[in-house]
Amino acid sequence: MRHKRSTRRKRASATQLYQTCKAAGTCPPDVIPKVERTTIADQILKFGSLGVFFGGLGIGTGSGTGGRTGYVPLSTRPPTASAPTSTIRPPVSVDTVGPLDSSIVSMIEETSFIESGAPAPSIPTASGFDVATSADNTPAIINVSSIGESSVQSVTTHLNPTFTEPSVLRPFSSSEASGHLIFSTPTISTHSYEDIPMDTFIVSTTSDNVTSSTPIPRPRPTARLGLYSKGTQQVKVVDPAFLTSPRRLITFDNPAFQPTEPDETLYFQHQDISPAPDPDFLDIVALHRPALTSRKGTIRFSRLGSKATMKTRSGKQIGARVHYYQDLSPIVPADSIELQPLSRPVSSASHSINDGLYDVYMDPDTPFPQPSISYSLHSPQTTNVTVPLSSGFDFPFSSTVPLQPGPDIVSPVAPTYTPFVPVIPTSPFNNVLVYGSDFILHPSYFLRRRRKRFPYFFADVRVAA
């Protein structure tokens, strides 16, 4: 069997050795100069290039290709191919700009402007009247030539529906001198659009039945806190510090720093593993703002907390949502009292106070039970008795007093039943006279006590049966 030669492991490059051994100071002597370019050859090229330039010879540490132009003799030049070139001229002649000329070149050609507005009326020119002045007191003589019939000139203007000109008011010109009157009557066409009346969609009425166009404000819907969802843990807190300073239940107090407890969300950072003062607040990273709610007849102070029980490699914290609450005071339900009407229909009548009659229901007289066996099948009855009441003295005047019927009061009546044992015996009745409070029992009623004897046996040993 042929012996297999061991393969030679390749040595690491100088750059790889330099990265690991530079800090430790264990680099071979030929690694640092090669990487930092401080060898003898590098020093010669560095200082020799200051006085000699070998740029076109292609001398360097690269591959021997002769550079970009290749190897050429020192006494000759490489041949160059000449191609006919055309003279480049600007397509448009450029005007020269003098030092005093404006450097702003207008890129927009001059266009004709159209004056907007109504057309200006043409005013005819006339020579007017010839006025002769004289210093003599002679009457003025004016020669008026007959003009003849006056001509009327009409101008018609058509409106462009796609363009509406602004209305321009121009003063009327007086042309009575020449005897010509100018009238301008634009043509008015009927419009093609539809007139729609405006309606009020939101109308509110005040207490004085005054209609206004201000919209009625609606209450903003309250957001649900989700304190009692299935994924929220419910924890009841008994410590009163939960209301004023909940930070004491999560972190330990610092005597040199006493922060205020605002009514907003509190955030906590746990750099090391340390237990909380209250075990219910372990791993709490956020404690949200408080909320007052009413549930099951109590006023409840609630805060929603977030825990960071687990932390992934990406830095995301995963934990449960906890609802911490503390009941402040119970809400006592109102007593349900049946209310009676306070007022009834009032009837007024003129009468005297002494003449008032009142109805009183009287209980019937209970008859003495007789020794007869008879069953009553009828219900008890009440009688209505009218009793006049007097105040003891009469008033000399009569007044109008409103009368209100009072409630009817029925007195309870005991049920009627027949006893099993008659109160009065049916046998011959004998009178019994009692002269004292003591009595003597007849000797025949005394029973003699007899003692019953039981045989007892005592033994110190076990007796065989």
UniProtKB/Swiss-Prot annotation:
It is found in: Virion; Host nucleus; Host early endosome; Host Golgi apparatus. Keywords: Capsid protein, Cytoplasmic inwards viral transport, Disulfide bond, DNA-binding, Host endosome, Host Golgi apparatus, Host nucleus, Host-virus interaction, Late protein, Microtubular inwards viral transport, Phosphoprotein, Viral penetration into host nucleus, Virion, Virus entry into host cell. GO terms for molecular function: DNA binding; structural molecule activity. Its main location: virion. Highly phosphorylated. Disulfide bonds join 21-27. The keyword DNA repair does not apply. GO terms for biological process: microtubule-dependent intracellular transport of viral material towards nucleus; symbiont entry into host cell; viral penetration into host nucleus. It holds the Pfam family Late_protein_L2. A motif (Nuclear localization signal) lies at residues 1-12, 447-454. The keyword Phosphoprotein applies. One of its GO terms (cellular component) is host cell Golgi apparatus. Interacts with major capsid protein L1. Interacts with E2; this interaction inhibits E2 transcriptional activity but not the DNA replication function E2. Interacts with host GADD45GIP1. Interacts with host HSPA8; this interaction is required for L2 nuclear translocation. Interacts with host importins KPNB2 and KPNB3. Forms a complex with importin alpha2-beta1 heterodimers via interaction with the importin alpha2 adapter. Interacts with host DYNLT1; this interaction is essential for virus intracellular transport during entry. Minor protein of the capsid that localizes along the inner surface of the virion, within the central cavities beneath the L1 pentamers. Plays a role in capsid stabilization through interaction with the major capsid protein L1. Once the virion enters the host cell, L2 escorts the genomic DNA into the nucleus by promoting escape from the endosomal compartments and traffic through the host Golgi network. Belongs to the papillomaviridae L2 protein family. This is Minor capsid protein L2. It comes from Human papillomavirus 67.
